[in-house]
């Protein structure tokens, strides 16, 4: 195979576009696509501090690598944050990888833990739960979002950047749809430019398979061991389902993403709610009690 861009030996075949690319042109195409996504949705503005959420997995480290390269030619700053859920053995390895990579890039790195923020690790939370329908992903996701908010505010960041890729977005849409939680579909609109603390997903238009290839092509270190609790949710089944569809119908993930953008904008307008303050902790929420306080009560009082 010959690269369509530079005529060198190709290493990647992009089925949904029909392109064949060498490693360098492939990496440049990913950088260009991410930059276009950031520009299109006004994700980062001049002189802003971006709180980059880096777990140690492939997605977040690819995100950090790309944002670091972009920061050399654009006017924004980076600070890396890692959330320690308290999963023995698993998180320890990831923290070492992130710390080492941040030292290499000369970017400041801070760690925030569930234990300090909520007085519960994820493992302790799982031991407390009595309702097995309450998945580890539900507990972890609720705590993680609050932990990232806290981290970003504590460092005076303007933006929180996470490594969610195209596949993650599609899976989340299906999870919200299948669970009947349609309000959350409105949260999926990538245009968050009006929010005080913006949460952005610069990799939201990049296939997971291409993130893997980018990581290997650029020799990025990342944790390969999956979360020990990942099989509790439906996400793995949905990943396999979507990959099967894409295998038989190249580009179907891109088509689905385009539909999700339109649906999320409609739902966002229809479900607009005034922001309130939680009566327990004082954090911003849409009801009387925030999701974190509800979760802690559910775990400790059941």
Segments predicted by a language model, with ranges:
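ATP-dependent adenylation/nucleotidyltransferase module used to activate substrates
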Residues: 2-175, 179-186, 205-218, 290
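Flexible helical/loop "lid" subdomain adjacent to adenine-nucleotide binding pockets
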Residues: 31, 39, 49, 167-171, ...
């Amino acid at each position: 195979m010959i690269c369509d861009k530079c005529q060198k030996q190709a290493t990647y075949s992009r089925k949904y576009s029909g392109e064949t690319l060498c490693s360098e042109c492939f990496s440049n195409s990913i950088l260009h696509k991410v930059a276009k996504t950031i520009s299109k949705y006004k994700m980062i503005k001049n002189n802003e501090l971006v709180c980059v959420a880096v777990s140690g997995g492939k997605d977040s480290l690819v995100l950090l690598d790309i944002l670091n390269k972009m920061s050399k030619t654009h006017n924004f700053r980076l600070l890396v944050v890692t959330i320690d859920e308290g999963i023995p053995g698993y998180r320890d390895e990831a923290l070492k990888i992130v710390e080492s990579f941040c030292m290499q890039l000369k970017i400041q790195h801070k760690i925030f833990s569930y234990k300090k923020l909520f007085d519960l690790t994820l493992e302790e939370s799982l031991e407390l739960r009595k309702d097995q329908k309450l998945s580890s992903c539900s507990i972890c996701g609720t705590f993680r979002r609050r932990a990232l908010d806290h981290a970003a505010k504590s460092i005076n960041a303007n933006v929180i950047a996470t490594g969610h890729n195209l596949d993650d977005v599609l899976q989340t849409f299906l999870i919200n749809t299948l669970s009947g939680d349609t309000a959350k579909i409105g949260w999926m609109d990538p245009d968050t430019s009006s929010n005080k603390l913006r949460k952005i997903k610069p990799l939201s238009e990049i296939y997971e398979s291409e993130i893997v290839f980018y990581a290997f092509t650029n020799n990025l270190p990342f944790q390969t061991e999956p979360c020990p609790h990942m099989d509790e949710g439906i996400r793995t089944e949905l990943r396999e389902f979507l990959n099967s569809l894409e295998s038989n119908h190249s580009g179907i993930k891109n088509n689905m993403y385009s539909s999700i953008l339109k649906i999320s904008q409609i739902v966002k307008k229809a479900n607009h709610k005034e922001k309130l303050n939680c009566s327990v902790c004082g954090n911003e929420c849409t009801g009387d009690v925030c999701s974190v306080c509800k979760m802690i009560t559910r775990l400790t009082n059941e």
